[in-house]
Amino acid sequence: MNDNLDLFSGAAPAAPESGAAPDKVLAKVQALRAQLNQWAHEYYVLDTPTVPDGEYDRVFQQLQALEGAYPELVTPDSPTQRVIGAVLDGLMPVRHAVPMLSIRTETDNEATGAEAFDARIRKELELAEGAPPVEYVAEPKFDGLAMNLRYENGRLVQATTRGDGEVGEDVTHNIRTIRKIPLSLPEGKGVPPVVEVRGEVYMGRADFVKLNERQQAAGGKSFANPRNAAAGSVRQLDSGIAAQRPLSFFAYGLGEITPAAQGGPDFVTHYAMLQTLRDWGFPVAPQVCIAKGAAELVAFHQRMGAERATLPYEIDGVVYKVNSLAQQRQLGFVSREPRWAVAHKYPAEEMPTRMEGIDIQVGRTGKLTPVARLAPVAVGGVIVTNATLHNLFEIRKKRVRTGDTVVVRRAGDVIPEVVGRVPGDRPAYVPNFRMPAACPICGSAVARPKGEANHRCTGGLFCPAQRKEAILHFAARRAMDIEGLGDKLVDQLVDGHVVRTLPDLYRLGLVALASLDRMAEKSAQNVLDALEKSKKTTLSRFLFGLGIRQVGESTAKDLARHFGQLDAIMDASVEQLLQVRDVGPIVAESIHTFFAQPHNREVVEQLRACGVHWEEGAAREQTAQPLAGMTVVLTGTLPTLGRDQAKEMLEAAGAKVSGSVSKKTSYVVAGAEAGSKLAKAEELGVTVLDEAGMLALLAGGDR
């Protein structure tokens, strides 16, 4: 290190005098930060360290000491602030300034799929047969977590997950801990006042293995794959935990950015934008390259497929993007997906291994699922020891028995499944597998309902396996939304016989909760507060939370709108239930059977007695349905209403909310960044409304 950076050598700084820090100290702090940022960039991004770790640590400690002596000099982008030890109560939702749209994934996963994409692009651009090849940027498709990094005046101010594309979660406290992500951008390199950099947070293969080794040594839970490890780390409330996880980042695009007319960069190509991101200190995948025409895209697909298993991080495919930004604008979007880009996934990876046995898992609805217990095998960089066999009929169809050598596939590169048996000798005297007659968890009888392939435990909420899953489902965000009631807490509550039924949740006390492992008084009070808050809900959320088989979120809303009151639903006949939109015989029978059980009715009444309530409404037949029979499409970002909120309002008025525009569409409600749906509506002559127009329509205004 240069001598002029040594403000003091090993000794603590002198006690500061009152008032602002001296100019000499400020200059030295800025110099130390610049040097540390440069070394960190060389080490974490360029992989070419120029100083020993000890030298970096020594300068880092000098900066820490100076900031400790002069706390007014501490800034959020200082290298010392990557880990601030903050523990949040929850992740805050953030609406994206520019929606994080997804790229269409082709079902054709062969390299030749690139030829079809290129042909489609040339047709859309109306290029003649002899015209020069289209220039693309070819990129690996990372298997991680999409992230939006917002910088204002060169400083990282917010990091947000993709979420549903419109609204994500603020995870800035954790993203600051990732060394490959710069906290500040360099001066003098054309960084605009506002820029959002988008990319993928991931965990390398070797880092993933080491993390699981540490987890196992500490008695913790291992992660199934690097993507789950990365996603779980990013969504931690405690940044100290995230800081211990070896996360990395690759940049691949932009969100909101200061326009060129206001001093922002004027990019001509996607590749030039990526090169600029490199110059600003962001890591960009080294495999990214320009490909001219279909032949070079095919070659890239084949090259990445051959290198895939040896890469230090997981990829599950490749992405092709038209390089010219002018051509991107010309191509536009369709169904909120860019026409100018496509993803091609590689086929699922398969490996042989020995099936050592078949275990039974009992799910939330009582379904018994046979699971193959396997000799450990690496499939796509993940050690697989279990794989689903789905049901008895699948086992018979695949003709697998204990002791067989079977082929295991990671379907979608995530879920392991047994594909089939490898022909050859099998051990003698191995009988065919039979489903148990009694539930392995509670001992209740097992039955297979008529017309179904699945066997089920008849124990209901009395079965601990169903009890845990039923409680977790009841507490889920889209059901009763009981924050803090997660897997580990539910395990303790059920295993400790503290909670046996759903109403028991609302009878919990502070002393009982606080006495559980890893549950301090403050955490216990937070759970109690969340339970109290959840008592005021909606009929559709309550119905969904009960976990009735075949009743998802949409069906629960339809039931609530049709009947208006819970008692009417509970007393409805199968014939009456069949009058509800999208409810068929199987769903109607499931609902009727659920409420015919005395113990289920008792649970409902006890929940009401505990204070769970909602606003009862009139039945649909008695309620005005101004938009009955109409189809409405939502597109873009509305000024004050979220997409889910607008959808609920429209559906409550009898409209069907569709995801695509056609001649049968009655209205298109358009907000900012409306895209191709708006263009399609104008082309077909469909009436377009803004948010105010939609509200007027709902209020009974002119159609």
UniProtKB/Swiss-Prot annotation:
- Which keywords accompany this UniProt record? DNA damage, DNA repair, DNA replication, Ligase, Magnesium, Manganese, Metal-binding, NAD, Zinc
Specify the BRCT domain's residue ranges.
622-703
| GO CC entries | cytosol
Tell me which cofactor or cofactors this protein depends on. Mg(2+); Mn(2+)
Q: Does the record carry DNA repair as a key word?
A: yes
Task: List positions binding Zn(2+).
Answer: 439, 442, 457, 463
| EC code(s) of this entry | 6.5.1.2
Region: Disordered; residue ranges are: 1-20
How is this protein named in the record?
DNA ligase
Q: Which organism is it from?
A: Delftia acidovorans (strain DSM 14801 / SPH-1)
